[in-house]
UniProtKB/Swiss-Prot annotation:
This is UPF0346 protein lin1971. Pfam families: YozE_SAM_like (PF06855). InterPro entries: UPF0346, YozE_SAM-like, YozE_SAM-like_sf. Gene3D superfamilies: YozE SAM-like. Belongs to the UPF0346 family.
Length: 77
């Protein structure tokens, strides 16, 4: 079984970078309610839409979700 989206997202954390993906990762790290164990797209979308004012747009999440799926597929074998 692969890692959760949250664990994938944490690979983008960096205290010095300020791009949108890094900011999302840093803010999710500080968000104690973030669904850390889920791998479900819909659960994550619902959470982010209603509880993540730090995310300026869902396109950032969508890009990272696609990267997450590719990474999971690559690491499956």
């Amino acid at each position: 079984m692969g890692r959760s989206f949250y664990h994938f997202l944490m690979t983008y954390r960096d205290p010095k970078l300020t791009d949108q993906k890094t900011e999302f990762a840093n803010n999710a790290y500080r968000d104690h309610s973030f669904p850390k164990q889920t791998r479900n797209y819909h659960i994550l979308c619902d959470y982010l839409e209603f509880n993540a004012p730090y995310l300026p747009g869902m396109s950032i999440f969508d890009e990272l979700w696609e990267a997450y799926l590719l990474d999971e597929e690559k690491n499956k074998h």
